[in-house]
Amino acid sequence: MARNEIRPIVKLRSTAGTGYTYVTRKNRRNDPDRIVLRKYDPVLRRHVEFREER
C-alpha cells in the first residue's frame, strides 16, 4: 500500500498538441510539483516538453 502512495502513476502529455502520452511513476517527496520532461514525440519525430497530467 505504501508504494502506491509515495510513487503514484502519472501521465505525461505532449505540449505540442499531438495527444501522445507517456506513463511513468514519480516520487512525491522529491517532486511535489507537476513534472515537466523533454522527451521524444514519435508523431512529430522530435523532442518536445511533456507535462504531468492528473
From Swiss-Prot:
Pfam families: Ribosomal_L33
GO biological process, one term: translation
PROSITE patterns according to UniProt: RIBOSOMAL_L33
Residue ranges of the TM segments: none
GO molecular function: structural constituent of ribosome
GO cellular component: cytosolic large ribosomal subunit
Disulfide bond positions: none
Superkingdom in the source lineage: Bacteria
Alphabetical UniProt keywords: Ribonucleoprotein, Ribosomal protein
Any coiled-coil regions, as ranges: none
InterPro entries: Ribosomal_bL33 (IPR001705), Ribosomal_bL33_CS (IPR018264), Ribosomal_bL33_sf (IPR038584), Ribosomal_zn-bd (IPR011332)
Gene3D superfamilies linked to this entry: Ribosomal protein L33 (2.20.28.120)
Family: Belongs to the bacterial ribosomal protein bL33 family.
HAMAP family linked: Ribosomal_bL33
Name of the featured protein: Large ribosomal subunit protein bL33B
Native source organism of the sequence: Mycolicibacterium smegmatis (strain ATCC 700084 / mc(2)155)
